[in-house]
Protein backbone atom coordinates (compact mmCIF):
# COMPACT_ATOMS: atom_id res chain seq x y z
CA UNK A 1 0.00 0.00 0.00
CA UNK A 2 1.16 3.54 -0.80
CA UNK A 3 1.00 6.75 1.19
CA UNK A 4 1.02 10.06 -0.64
CA UNK A 5 0.42 13.78 -0.44
CA UNK A 6 0.64 16.78 -2.78
CA UNK A 7 2.55 19.94 -1.97
CA UNK A 8 4.55 22.90 -3.19
CA UNK A 9 8.31 23.34 -3.05
CA UNK A 10 9.29 26.29 -0.83
CA UNK A 11 13.07 26.14 -1.12
CA UNK A 12 16.16 24.69 0.53
CA UNK A 13 17.75 25.29 3.91
CA UNK A 14 19.94 23.52 6.48
CA UNK A 15 19.01 21.91 9.78
CA UNK A 16 20.92 20.23 12.59
CA UNK A 17 20.22 16.78 13.98
CA UNK A 18 20.27 16.15 17.73
CA UNK A 19 23.84 14.88 17.26
CA UNK A 20 24.97 18.17 15.71
CA UNK A 21 25.14 16.91 12.13
CA UNK A 22 24.30 19.54 9.50
CA UNK A 23 22.10 18.28 6.67
CA UNK A 24 20.64 20.11 3.64
CA UNK A 25 16.87 19.80 3.32
CA UNK A 26 14.13 20.86 0.92
CA UNK A 27 11.10 22.44 2.57
CA UNK A 28 7.77 21.42 1.06
CA UNK A 29 4.48 23.04 2.01
CA UNK A 30 1.77 20.39 2.03
CA UNK A 31 -1.58 21.89 2.98
CA UNK A 32 -4.36 19.41 3.83
CA UNK A 33 -5.20 17.54 0.60
CA UNK A 34 -8.87 17.01 -0.23
CA UNK A 35 -9.92 13.56 -1.44
CA UNK A 36 -11.81 14.50 -4.61
CA UNK A 37 -12.55 10.93 -5.68
CA UNK A 38 -12.04 7.39 -4.43
CA UNK A 39 -11.44 4.98 -7.31
CA UNK A 40 -12.10 1.26 -6.85
CA UNK A 41 -11.49 -1.83 -9.00
CA UNK A 42 -15.25 -2.40 -9.27
CA UNK A 43 -16.04 1.01 -10.79
CA UNK A 44 -12.76 2.18 -12.33
CA UNK A 45 -10.69 -0.97 -12.82
CA UNK A 46 -8.01 0.05 -10.32
CA UNK A 47 -7.63 1.39 -6.80
CA UNK A 48 -6.55 5.02 -6.26
CA UNK A 49 -7.17 8.23 -4.36
CA UNK A 50 -7.57 11.44 -6.35
CA UNK A 51 -6.16 14.29 -4.27
CA UNK A 52 -6.35 18.04 -4.83
CA UNK A 53 -4.56 20.93 -3.15
CA UNK A 54 -4.45 24.75 -3.38
CA UNK A 55 -7.76 26.37 -4.30
CA UNK A 56 -8.33 27.63 -7.81
CA UNK A 57 -10.33 30.79 -8.47
CA UNK A 58 -13.86 29.96 -9.52
CA UNK A 59 -13.55 32.10 -12.65
CA UNK A 60 -10.51 30.03 -13.69
CA UNK A 61 -12.27 26.67 -13.26
CA UNK A 62 -14.59 25.28 -15.91
CA UNK A 63 -17.98 23.73 -15.14
CA UNK A 64 -16.77 20.08 -15.06
CA UNK A 65 -14.03 21.02 -12.56
CA UNK A 66 -16.50 22.91 -10.38
CA UNK A 67 -18.98 20.04 -10.44
CA UNK A 68 -16.30 17.46 -9.67
CA UNK A 69 -15.04 19.43 -6.66
CA UNK A 70 -18.58 20.13 -5.45
CA UNK A 71 -19.15 16.38 -4.95
CA UNK A 72 -16.38 16.49 -2.35
CA UNK A 73 -17.76 19.74 -0.83
CA UNK A 74 -14.58 21.55 -1.83
CA UNK A 75 -13.41 24.36 -4.09
CA UNK A 76 -11.78 23.52 -7.46
CA UNK A 77 -8.11 22.69 -7.00
CA UNK A 78 -5.03 23.90 -8.89
CA UNK A 79 -3.05 20.68 -8.50
CA UNK A 80 -4.81 17.33 -8.82
CA UNK A 81 -3.08 13.95 -8.90
CA UNK A 82 -3.83 10.30 -8.17
CA UNK A 83 -2.12 8.07 -5.61
CA UNK A 84 -2.39 4.46 -6.74
CA UNK A 85 -3.16 1.75 -4.15
CA UNK A 86 -3.39 4.37 -1.42
CA UNK A 87 -3.13 3.29 2.19
CA UNK A 88 -5.94 4.17 4.59
CA UNK A 89 -9.73 4.10 4.62
CA UNK A 90 -10.55 7.48 3.07
CA UNK A 91 -13.87 8.74 1.80
CA UNK A 92 -14.72 11.49 -0.67
CA UNK A 93 -14.28 14.85 1.04
CA UNK A 94 -11.78 13.62 3.65
CA UNK A 95 -8.44 15.38 4.11
CA UNK A 96 -4.94 13.93 3.95
CA UNK A 97 -2.51 15.82 6.17
CA UNK A 98 1.25 16.04 6.31
CA UNK A 99 1.48 13.79 9.37
CA UNK A 100 0.75 10.84 7.09
CA UNK A 101 4.57 10.69 6.88
CA UNK A 102 7.04 10.58 9.76
CA UNK A 103 10.73 11.38 10.15
CA UNK A 104 12.93 8.45 9.12
CA UNK A 105 10.74 7.23 6.26
CA UNK A 106 11.83 7.25 2.62
CA UNK A 107 9.78 8.77 -0.20
CA UNK A 108 9.77 9.35 -3.96
CA UNK A 109 9.23 12.97 -5.02
CA UNK A 110 7.92 13.77 -8.50
CA UNK A 111 7.97 17.20 -10.13
CA UNK A 112 8.63 19.21 -13.29
CA UNK A 113 12.32 20.12 -13.66
CA UNK A 114 13.52 23.67 -14.22
CA UNK A 115 13.32 24.83 -17.84
CA UNK A 116 16.57 25.99 -19.48
CA UNK A 117 15.30 26.80 -22.97
CA UNK A 118 17.08 25.74 -26.18
CA UNK A 119 20.58 24.46 -25.36
CA UNK A 120 23.43 22.88 -27.26
CA UNK A 121 24.43 19.24 -27.06
CA UNK A 122 27.36 19.92 -24.72
CA UNK A 123 25.28 21.50 -21.94
CA UNK A 124 22.13 19.48 -22.63
CA UNK A 125 23.65 16.02 -23.10
CA UNK A 126 27.18 16.29 -21.74
CA UNK A 127 28.89 15.63 -25.08
CA UNK A 128 32.58 16.44 -25.58
CA UNK A 129 33.63 19.60 -27.38
CA UNK A 130 35.77 19.73 -30.50
CA UNK A 131 39.42 20.83 -30.76
CA UNK A 132 39.93 24.40 -29.53
CA UNK A 133 42.89 25.08 -31.85
CA UNK A 134 42.67 27.85 -34.48
CA UNK A 135 42.68 25.35 -37.32
CA UNK A 136 39.57 23.59 -36.06
CA UNK A 137 36.32 24.50 -37.80
CA UNK A 138 34.07 23.34 -34.97
CA UNK A 139 34.28 23.76 -31.21
CA UNK A 140 30.84 23.23 -29.65
CA UNK A 141 28.88 21.98 -32.67
CA UNK A 142 27.22 18.53 -32.60
CA UNK A 143 29.69 17.15 -35.15
CA UNK A 144 29.07 14.52 -37.82
CA UNK A 145 25.55 13.11 -38.18
CA UNK A 146 26.78 9.98 -39.92
CA UNK A 147 27.65 9.10 -43.51
CA UNK A 148 25.55 8.67 -46.67
CA UNK A 149 22.07 8.27 -45.14
CA UNK A 150 20.18 11.47 -45.91
CA UNK A 151 17.88 11.48 -42.91
CA UNK A 152 18.04 11.94 -39.14
CA UNK A 153 17.24 8.83 -37.13
CA UNK A 154 14.70 9.14 -34.34
CA UNK A 155 16.42 9.56 -30.97
CA UNK A 156 19.54 11.22 -32.37
CA UNK A 157 21.26 13.28 -29.65
CA UNK A 158 21.08 16.87 -30.86
CA UNK A 159 20.58 20.39 -29.47
CA UNK A 160 17.06 21.16 -28.32
CA UNK A 161 14.76 22.04 -25.44
CA UNK A 162 16.38 21.40 -22.06
CA UNK A 163 14.39 20.89 -18.86
CA UNK A 164 10.67 21.10 -18.22
CA UNK A 165 10.45 17.30 -17.90
CA UNK A 166 8.56 15.16 -15.41
CA UNK A 167 11.18 13.53 -13.20
CA UNK A 168 11.13 11.45 -10.01
CA UNK A 169 13.80 11.54 -7.30
CA UNK A 170 13.68 8.17 -5.55
CA UNK A 171 14.37 7.05 -1.99
CA UNK A 172 14.75 10.45 -0.30
CA UNK A 173 14.83 10.60 3.49
CA UNK A 174 12.11 12.48 5.38
CA UNK A 175 14.17 14.56 7.80
CA UNK A 176 11.24 16.01 9.71
CA UNK A 177 7.53 16.83 9.70
CA UNK A 178 5.86 19.92 11.16
CA UNK A 179 2.06 19.34 11.23
CA UNK A 180 1.39 22.74 12.86
CA UNK A 181 2.78 24.59 9.83
CA UNK A 182 2.00 21.90 7.19
CA UNK A 183 5.68 21.46 6.35
CA UNK A 184 7.69 18.40 5.44
CA UNK A 185 11.49 18.46 5.30
CA UNK A 186 13.19 16.12 2.82
CA UNK A 187 16.92 15.51 2.85
CA UNK A 188 18.62 16.69 -0.35
CA UNK A 189 17.07 18.35 -3.37
CA UNK A 190 13.92 17.54 -5.31
CA UNK A 191 12.99 18.24 -8.96
CA UNK A 192 11.54 21.62 -9.85
CA UNK A 193 11.85 25.32 -9.17
CA UNK A 194 10.66 27.04 -6.01
CA UNK A 195 6.85 27.32 -5.82
CA UNK A 196 6.44 24.38 -8.21
CA UNK A 197 4.04 21.56 -7.36
CA UNK A 198 5.37 18.16 -6.29
CA UNK A 199 3.91 14.74 -5.52
CA UNK A 200 5.30 12.84 -2.53
CA UNK A 201 4.72 9.09 -2.34
CA UNK A 202 6.11 6.14 -0.42
CA UNK A 203 9.26 4.93 -2.15
CA UNK A 204 9.06 1.89 -4.39
CA UNK A 205 12.58 0.84 -3.38
CA UNK A 206 13.32 -1.33 -0.33
CA UNK A 207 14.59 0.57 2.72
CA UNK A 208 15.15 0.41 6.45
CA UNK A 209 13.66 3.26 8.47
CA UNK A 210 16.29 5.75 9.64
CA UNK A 211 16.39 6.96 13.25
CA UNK A 212 16.84 10.65 12.46
CA UNK A 213 15.94 13.33 14.99
CA UNK A 214 16.31 17.06 14.45
CA UNK A 215 17.45 19.43 17.17
CA UNK A 216 14.71 21.81 18.36
CA UNK A 217 11.38 22.25 16.60
CA UNK A 218 11.25 21.67 12.86
CA UNK A 219 9.24 24.79 12.07
CA UNK A 220 11.28 27.21 14.19
CA UNK A 221 14.39 27.25 11.98
CA UNK A 222 12.39 27.36 8.76
CA UNK A 223 10.19 30.22 10.02
CA UNK A 224 13.23 32.13 11.28
CA UNK A 225 14.91 31.88 7.87
CA UNK A 226 11.71 32.97 6.08
CA UNK A 227 11.46 35.93 8.46
CA UNK A 228 15.08 36.94 7.76
CA UNK A 229 14.43 36.75 4.00
CA UNK A 230 11.28 38.87 4.31
CA UNK A 231 13.05 41.53 6.40
CA UNK A 232 15.92 41.68 3.88
CA UNK A 233 13.49 42.13 0.98
CA UNK A 234 11.66 44.86 2.93
CA UNK A 235 14.91 46.75 3.58
CA UNK A 236 15.87 46.50 -0.10
CA UNK A 237 12.45 47.87 -1.13
CA UNK A 238 12.74 50.77 1.36
CA UNK A 239 16.23 51.61 0.09
CA UNK A 240 14.96 51.57 -3.50
CA UNK A 241 12.05 53.87 -2.61
CA UNK A 242 14.39 56.31 -0.79
CA UNK A 243 16.68 56.44 -3.83
CA UNK A 244 13.73 57.11 -6.13
CA UNK A 245 12.49 59.92 -3.85
CA UNK A 246 15.95 61.52 -3.75
CA UNK A 247 16.10 61.59 -7.55
UniProtKB/Swiss-Prot annotation:
Keywords carried by this UniProt record: Ribonucleoprotein, Ribosomal protein, RNA-binding, rRNA-binding
- The answer to whether UniProt assigns keyword Hydrolase to this entry is no
Question: Keyword RNA-binding, does the record have it?
Answer: yes
Locate the region Disordered. Answer: 124-145, 218-247
MF-aspect GO terms: rRNA binding; structural constituent of ribosome
Basic and acidic residues compositional bias, start-end: 222-241
One of the protein's GO biological processes: translation
Show the GO cellular component annotation of the record.
Answer: cytosolic large ribosomal subunit
Q: What does this protein do?
A: One of the primary rRNA binding proteins, it binds directly near the 3'-end of the 23S rRNA, where it nucleates assembly of the 50S subunit.
Give the UniProt family note: Belongs to the universal ribosomal protein uL3 family.
Task: Report quaternary structure and partners.
Answer: Part of the 50S ribosomal subunit. Forms a cluster with proteins L14 and L19.
**Protein name as catalogued:** Large ribosomal subunit protein uL3
Gene name linked to the record = rplC
Amino acid sequence: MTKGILGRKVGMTQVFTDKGELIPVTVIEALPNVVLQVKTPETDGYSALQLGVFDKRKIAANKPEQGHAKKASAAPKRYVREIRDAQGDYKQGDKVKVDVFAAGEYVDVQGITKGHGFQGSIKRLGQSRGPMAHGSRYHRRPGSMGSIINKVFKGKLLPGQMGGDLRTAQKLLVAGVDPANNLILIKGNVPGANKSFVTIKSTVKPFKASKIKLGGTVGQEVKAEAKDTASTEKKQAETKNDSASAE
